[in-house]
């Protein structure tokens, strides 16, 4: 039986997990909850056997996880993608944190009614944050060397054209194009992209 990945029907926190699963060619079943499925989720959440019921969740046999980073790390570990020594594992954790700084920066302003004002400061800081990744990629094939790791999927925009399984997924009907954030986000929310 294929593992089950449950989340809202948005890209959100689980998109890097989807990209990693697609890259690996690992079959999975997705349980998507639409914006009006709050009651459905509340009725299901305590029946799944999860220690900490939440979205996203990932059920792989007797492994039942919640929290996006725990899920991503579990899948990476299953496929020997967490680094081969303490130094590599620490660098991968560092990359996770650096990418999450950017992601949380976007989320912090995406749900704020003052988005247009706040985005100016964020966009001024963004080149400096991205420069660190550019410097790292200038001497590595991937973020942590010559082997793809899960932080690469967290920063997938830099890689999607070069990885055929990801390109295929992005062109499939399984790829969720919108919303980027939750439906209520000032930026990246709603039912359709801005025109």
UniProtKB/Swiss-Prot annotation:
GO biological process assignments: glutathione metabolic process
CDD domains: GST_N_Mu
Domain GST C-terminal: 85-195
Annotated positions binding substrate: 111
PROSITE patterns named in the record: GST_CTER, GST_NTER
Pfam family, one: GST_N
Domain GST N-terminal: 1-83
Subunit-level organization: Homodimer.
Protein name: Glutathione S-transferase class-mu 26 kDa isozyme
